[in-house]
Amino acid sequence: MADAPERTPAHRTQPLPDEVAVIARAASGDRTAFAQLMEHYQSACYGLAWRLLHDPDQAADATQDAFIHAYKAIGSYRGGIFRSWLLRITANASYDILRRAQRRPSSPLPDPDEGAPELADLAAINPHAEAMKSEMYRHLEVALRRLPEDQRTAVVLCDVYGMDYNEVAAMTSSALGTVKSRIHRGRLRLRELLAEHRELFTG
């Protein structure tokens, strides 16, 4: 799949040069322009899908489904941040897979490390040794997975993808106050889940 997705807000995927023009060409049916957009944002989309699904094969499926949907819908794109529009489609594709999986008999949980893109440093993390980072990321991924779906999505979008509250609210079609509450409760729950590994996250 794609390279590891964005690590911190400073490393967020930036818009393509002349992205508005590329989008316009894609919307008019230019497949090369559309492929250029998808290649540019592939890592971000896969990273989001993986963190919502925690399964590399399902994340790949969700990303592919999102790109197919985006190809069909790009003609109706009406502006705004293209990255957020595409990530919203990716999140919806991931939720569709989750809903289908819930209707099937349960299967063994995948290894938390399998196919995992490298997690961005959350705001409260200050790793004090390079050797501890792998273990730290593992515990973070497992803890994120234990959050309720709405809290996990909000925390991932805000603390991993660097979106502000307004962007998260727009992307998840939620009220601003609801988003703030989800992020606050999600962060508190993460602290509780990671309390026994406190030495990994403090300097």
Model regions: which residues?
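N-terminal module of bacterial RNA polymerase sigma factors
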Residues: 1-44, 145, 192, 202-203
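Amphipathic, Lys/Arg- and hydrophobic-enriched alpha-helical face
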Residues: 38-56, 73, 144, 189, ...
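Sigma70-family region 2
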Residues: 27-28, 54, 65-82, 100-102
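Short, charged helix-capping/linker segments at alpha-helix termini
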Residues: 12-13, 27-36, 46-65, 176, ...
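Helix-turn-helix DNA-binding module
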Residues: 57, 138-153, 157-178
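Internal acidic/polar
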Residues: 4-8, 12-19, 104-130, 164
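Arg/Lys-rich amphipathic alpha helix in sigma70-family domain 2
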Residues: 73-76, 88-109, 133, 196
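Short, Lys/Arg-enriched C-terminal cap helix and immediately downstream tail that follows
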Residues: 2, 99-100, 152, 187-203
